[in-house]
Amino acid sequence: MKQLRLEPVVQVRGEINIPGSKSISNRALLLATLAKGTTTLTNLLDSDDIRHMLASLKQLGVEYRLSQNNTVCELIGLGGAISADTAQTLFLGNAGTAMRPLCAALTLGRGEFTLTGEPRMEERPIGDLVDALKQLGANIVYLKNEGFPPLAINATGLNGGDVEIAGDLSSQFLTALLMVAPLAKDSVNIHVKGELVSKPYIDITLALMAQFGVQVINHDYARFEIPAGQQYVSPGKVLVEGDASSASYFLAAGAIKGGEVKVTGVGRLSIQGDVKFADVLEKMGADIEWGDDYIIARGAPLTAVDLDMNHIPDAAMTIATAALFAKGTTTIRNIYNWRIKETDRLAAMATELRKVGALVEEGHDYIQITPPAVLNTAEIDTYNDHRMAMCFSMMAFANCGITINDPDCTSKTFPDYFAQFASLKV
């Protein structure tokens, strides 16, 4: 197993241009596929999740050209649903942002499709989405365990009408349903059951759908009306803004050991909810400065917070390791959906924080972290989870440093993360 040793860092300073957002990249690729016209996507994220989406689209007959560095994609839209004359099996790795939307999109046209992935994907729920699609007439069969991939789709198009979908587990289910609803045979009325988690991710979806010319009537996130007879039309160019979750590590670095760290590609004009991570750092005592497309974090003594972080679950993970450098006990609440991500992130985070000496209480949907007087070095297991690896890079700011096991798992969203992180050292 590969290991990466991070030696203690005294101070950080610098500027990082954040790679494209994973959430926006895969949504935009799918909408461009369903749209009429050719779309040029710039600042596309070059990572495993995006490669799985691109490989699947190519297999389904979608034509596109990628730049040499894979960050510009010119894609010729189908002007409607995806159909296939021969049965297709698509391997989607552990990419939830490809599995969920493609599962929905492939019900719109004609053909037989099988969706598979890595072993962890077979543990990540998809039942709430499948139940909703079945209400609209989709024919989907589970090939192993009820409610989980792999699954088979026999596509004949989607009817419209009323549909209920659970909102309390993952916003990706609602995102997938919203993106396909305009191409159903009749108008679609989506009723959301329970509290909607990760609401800002729905805002990303709605903003992109509007960019591609589709109207959605949002009744306070409890009900969505999507009128029939709409078509996605390419806006020509789509700029993928920087990944706000990825920005969180560099902003935390600035808050803990700045100096001054500036991230570009996200800012006050961002459509991603995870930029609110900077507000949490400010509550902890960091000096934060906002621009339209940048955020600056400057170091200051940090104090603990007790916050509901349901709407920024990915960036909230960074608070868990930043808490090691804050005075007092930090509590992160309402984060049950950490448990259904790339790994059970609540259990994994609690285990690894204890290794470095923190006192940790792990609840059903919360985590409480009290830092020790002196942090210990440790070998951090990353559970094939990119965010675990990046979060624990913060331990470089302890006097003992840290060893990261399997650091290459960051390839899911940020292949050169550790090189960029190293560039901040003074």
From Swiss-Prot:
Its main location: cytoplasm. Its EC number is 2.5.1.19. Pathway: Metabolic intermediate biosynthesis; chorismate biosynthesis; chorismate from D-erythrose 4-phosphate and phosphoenolpyruvate: step 6/7. It is an enzyme of class 2 (transferase). The active site is at 314 (proton acceptor). Coiled coil: none annotated. It catalyses: 3-phosphoshikimate + phosphoenolpyruvate = 5-O-(1-carboxyvinyl)-3-phosphoshikimate + phosphate. GO terms for cellular component: cytoplasm. Belongs to the EPSP synthase family. Monomer. This is 3-phosphoshikimate 1-carboxyvinyltransferase. The gene is aroA.
